[in-house]
Structures are given as structure tokens and as C-alpha cells.
């Protein structure tokens, strides 16, 4: 039978979620910690977004459901330990990788690599759930791989290390590699969600991921785990161990860093809530297309906020990924409609045949 029509409200809810998520990377760029290390700045953001998720999600869920803390605990137990802990771990991996990559390289590079997520989701579904992968998805994967190679080629171009809006060659390359973890971990996360019980709720897993991410960030910062050491950082011997967890004081930037940190923590939670609500009625291929709004607008907002201008290689690779994923999403939607039409025709023929037999 033909697929049911998608309610306009569901589409608008998904679009609203993508639009709310779009400023996330610009807010991340505006968030400055009291450290000169991009590495420790990233973990400071992981700390606040992790514990923010832990603090915000359970109350929001309970208010939306009109439930009690005991009911939230029951939902967590019903989800099962494997999906609760596995989902939390996978979400933590992609979240940490995204924040670290975004602080080491161009936002446009990270978002372009992240946009390949639907392709990886298809391959994960085939590997773990036995779902078929259409030919146009394989073609899109090859084209996107070529575009990502263009992004990586930019990392080997010499650039100045003294420009805070232009990542150094080493950071740029490492950031691109770390960004590859994000769509892979997300693909496994969505596969875990799909393999869970039909009446299961993944919100407890997201809340637990906040505890894992926040605790991990605390260990990295307090344990003084190094990755990169800028010259400015080495010169600043008075820098506190807790500096990565302390946003720039309002006296220095007018409160921009603190406002950006609070806003991004709230906006990401709201954005994924809206996207989840919309995805109940909107086909997954169409949701993937809607999510490309962030790739199209995110780099522009970062440029407007902090003046970060990627090179032409980054723009070329990002444009290639955007065009390829748009074509792939449209092809997937067309496949769903053709399958729906075929089912409708078969049902109509069976109904007509049954009516004829009855009349005879």
C-alpha cells in the first residue's frame, strides 16, 4: 500500500530542529576558555555540554511526558543495559570527536565530513541489520570519498600558525582525521537505536552519555593530558589547571564566551529533540536532506561570527559533498515513492481481482 502522507507539522518540526542546530558551530567558535590550547578548549566544551546534557535531558523528558523520576528510571531499565551503555558510549564518542575536530580544523571541513553520515548509516544497517544498499548509495559513497580527499589535501598546504582563525597544518590534518570518527560513530548509534525494542526510549542513553563525556573531560583536564602545546601556552606559566574549564571573563569579552557556552548547550538539546519528533513521520532520507541545512549555513555563520574563511579546496570539497548528498537523498525519496506506488498498484489489482471473482 502507498506510504501515508507526511504531515506538514512533522516536516516543519524537522526543519526547525535543523535550523536550531545550525548556529552550534558558530557558538562553539565564540566560546573561549582561559587557555591558549585548542585541545584543552575542546575538552572544556565537552565538559559543559556533557554535564549540561545530563542535567537537562531527564527533567525535559519528565516534563514532556508528565512523568516522575521513578518512571524515567523504569524507562532506562526497559531500554536494557546493552543499549543503554552501548548507545551512551557511541554518542559520547561522536560528540567528543565532533567538538575536538571543530576546534582543530575548519568548521566547513568537519561539517562536510559529517554530512556523509547517512551513507555510513546505510552501510552499518547492511552490516548489522541485513538491510540492502541501493546502487546509487554506493556511487554517492565513492563520490563523497573523493570530495573528502580534496578536504584532506588542504591540510598539506602551508599556512601561518600565528592566525587564530587559520588552523596550523598539523592541527588541520588531525582534525580532519578525528572528524571521520563522527559519522562512523553516529551510524553505529542510529543502528543501535533501530535494533532496540520498538517501545524503548533512548533519552536515558543520551543522559548517560552526558555523564560519561563530562567525567572524561574532567579526567583529561585535571590529569593534564597533553596533545598540543602552543608557544603562547608555554610562555604562560601562570595558567591554572582549571583554566580549560573557565570561560573568558565577562570583563574581557562582554560575556560573549559564557553566553555562547550556555546557548549552545541548550540549543543542541532542543535541536535533537525537534529532529527526533519530526523523524517519527518524515522519511529518513528526507531527514538527511533537511540536516544538510547545517552544512550549507554553518560555515557562513562561522565566517560572520569570527571571520573564519576556509580555502578554496575546503569549499570545493564541501560543495561536492553537499551536492552528492542532496542527489542521494532525492534518489532515496524517489525509491520510496516508487515502492509505495508499486505496493498500491498491487493492492488495487488484488482488490479488483477479488471483486471480479465475487461478481462471477
What are these regions (language model features)?
Residues 9-17, 69-97, 174-182, 238-270, ...:
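Loop-to-transmembrane-helix transition segments
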Amino acid at each position: 500500500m502507498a506510504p501515508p502522507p507526511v504531515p506538514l507539522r512533522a516536516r516543519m518540526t524537522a526543519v526547525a530542529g535543523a535550523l536550531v542546530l545550525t548556529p552550534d558551530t558558530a557558538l562553539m567558535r565564540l566560546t573561549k576558555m582561559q587557555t591558549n590550547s585548542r585541545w584543552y578548549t575542546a575538552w572544556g566544551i565537552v565538559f559543559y555540554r556533557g554535564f549540561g546534557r545530563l542535567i537537562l535531558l531527564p527533567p525535559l523528558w519528565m516534563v514532556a511526558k508528565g512523568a516522575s523520576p521513578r518512571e524515567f528510571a523504569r524507562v532506562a531499565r526497559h531500554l536494557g543495559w546493552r543499549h543503554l551503555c552501548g548507545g551512551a558510549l557511541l554518542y559520547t564518542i561522536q560528540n567528543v570527536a565532533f567538538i575536538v575536530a571543530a576546534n582543530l580544523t575548519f568548521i566547513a571541513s568537519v561539517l562536510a565530513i559529517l554530512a556523509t553520515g547517512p551513507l555510513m548509516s546505510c552501510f552499518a544497517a547492511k552490516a548489522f541489520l541485513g538491510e540492502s544498499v541501493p546502487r546509487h548509495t554506493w556511487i554517492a559513497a565513492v563520490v563523497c570519498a573523493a570530495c573528502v580527499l580534496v578536504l584532506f589535501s588542504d591540510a598539506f598546504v602551508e599556512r601561518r600558525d600565528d592566525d587564530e582563525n587559520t588552523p596550523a597544518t598539523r592541527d588541520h590534518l588531525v582534525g580532519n582525521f578525528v572528524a571521520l570518527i563522527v559519522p562512523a560513530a553516529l551510524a553505529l548509534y542510529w543502528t543501535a537505536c533501530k535494533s532496540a525494542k520498538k517501545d524503548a526510549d533512548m533519552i536515558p542513553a543520551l543522559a548517560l552519555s552526558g555523564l560519561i563525556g563530562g567525567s572524561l573531560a574532567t579526567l583529561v583536564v585535571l590529569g593534564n593530558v597533553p596533545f598540543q602545546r602552543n608557544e603562547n601556552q608555554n610562555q604562560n606559566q601562570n595558567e591554572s589547571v582549571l583554566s580549560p574549564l573557565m570561560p573568558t571573563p565577562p570583563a574581557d569579552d562582554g560575556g560573549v564566551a559564557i553566553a555562547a557556552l550556555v546557548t549552545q548547550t541548550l540549543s543542541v538539546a532542543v535541536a535533537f529533540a525537534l529532529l527526533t519528533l519530526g523523524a517519527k513521520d518524515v522519511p529518513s532520507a528526507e531527514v538527511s536532506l533537511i540536516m544538510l541545512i547545517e552544512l550549507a549555513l554553518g560555515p557562513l555563520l562561522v565566517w560572520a561570527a569570527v571571520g573564519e574563511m576556509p580555502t578554496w579546496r575546503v569549499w570545493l570539497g564541501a560543495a561536492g559533498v553537499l551536492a552528492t548528498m542532496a542527489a542521494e537523498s532525492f534518489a532515496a525519496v524517489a525509491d520510496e515513492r516508487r515502492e509505495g506506488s508499486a505496493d498500491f498498484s498491487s493492492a488495487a489489482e488484488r482488490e479488483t481481482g477479488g471483486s471480479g471473482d465475487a461478481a462471477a
